């Protein structure tokens, strides 16, 4: 899956559940001091127009190693070539490959592709499990760590088991992705502008994930700069409206009502299911700013 479609998919996946609890969150913003949990389970859009091989992480066939066997190499290449128009079929192929070749040198690439496929089909537990295995094998896979750091806190709800443990893992992945992404070497033949965009796409997800981790921990003043950075460096034509919504919410929680209204208005200007929620958020933030004392930044 391309980086832009990956980011859009994550936004679509969360937009519905964020909309569902937005009104309650505003009502409770000055009562509980804690982030409201959303409801997961909405089926995400599967991006029907993806190109074959557009998996989210290219299956790099090692060229500097002798082939283990021709059958394994052929199976890996066949998996790489599978389009994302039938994700259940692609997932089955990846799982079958790993069962047949449990020690394959292609495991990191297959794991990475499965992470994105599982997220797109809302198999989040499998995504998190296979993502952990991928990072254990390839600790410099910044893209996988970034998407996990963003998805883990967005998928949490009131019934999430061991929420603090999950938040800690997301925080670790986000910080690690932010640390190593600027140091990654440019692949041979990749144009400079594409490389910069790819790195910014990864950093956008990582800062978004870290910001939401802090938000769920009640560290709103720490969440704000992370979410601001996520919006600032987003290489897509328009930023993820979910990040603008979260930035507005974090500013409301921190009693920065003017800044909250600005973020909500930017969110409301973008098409999507969060438009009305953010429009209402901007109006509510303005009312709160007129009746309550704003905290200094």
Regions found by a protein language model. Give the residues of each.
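Short solvent-exposed coil/turn linkers within tandem alpha-helical repeat scaffolds
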Residues: 100-107, 136-142, 161, 182-201, ...
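Residue-level recognition of tetratricopeptide repeat
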Residues: 116, 150, 154-157, 212, ...
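Terminal, low-structured helical/coil segments at or just beyond the last alpha-helical repeat
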Residues: 32, 186-188, 200, 204-216, ...
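"A position-specific structural signal for the A-helix of alpha-solenoid helical repeats
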Residues: 77, 113, 147, 209, ...
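N-terminal leader/linker segments that initiate helical-solenoid repeat arrays
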Residues: 25-109, 294-297
């Amino acid at each position: 899956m391309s980086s832009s479609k990956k980011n859009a998919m994550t936004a679509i996946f969360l937009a519905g559940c964020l909309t569902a609890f937005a009104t309650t969150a505003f009502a409770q913003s000055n009562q509980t001091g804690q982030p409201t949990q959303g409801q997961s389970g909405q089926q995400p859009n599967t991006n029907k127009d993806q190109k074959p091989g557009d998996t989210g992480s290219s299956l790099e066939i090692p060229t500097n190693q002798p082939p283990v066997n021709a059958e394994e190499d052929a199976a890996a290449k066949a998996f790489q070539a599978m389009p994302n128009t039938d994700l259940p079929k692609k997932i089955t192929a990846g799982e079958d490959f790993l069962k047949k070749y449990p020690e394959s040198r292609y495991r990191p690439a297959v794991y990475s592709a499965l992470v994105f496929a599982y997220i797109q089909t809302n198999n989040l537990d499998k995504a998190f499990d296979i993502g952990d295995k991928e990072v254990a094998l390839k600790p410099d896979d910044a893209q996988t760590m970034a998407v996990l750091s963003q998805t883990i806190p967005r998928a949490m709800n009131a019934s999430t088991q061991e929420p603090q443990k999950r938040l800690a893992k997301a925080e670790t992945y986000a910080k690690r992705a932010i640390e190593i992404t600027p140091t990654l070497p440019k692949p041979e033949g990749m144009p400079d502008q594409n490389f910069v965009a790819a790195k910014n796409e990864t950093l956008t997800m990582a800062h978004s994930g870290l910001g939401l981790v802090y938000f769920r921990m009640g560290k709103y003043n720490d969440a704000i700069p992370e979410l601001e950075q996520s919006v600032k460096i987003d290489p897509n034509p328009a930023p993820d409206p979910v990040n603008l919504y979260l930035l507005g919410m974090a500013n409301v929680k921190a009693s920065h009502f003017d800044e909250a209204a600005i973020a909500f208005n930017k969110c409301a200007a973008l098409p999507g299911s969060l438009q009305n929620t953010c429009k209402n958020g901007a109006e509510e933030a303005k009312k709160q700013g007129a009746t309550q004392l704003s905290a200094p930044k």
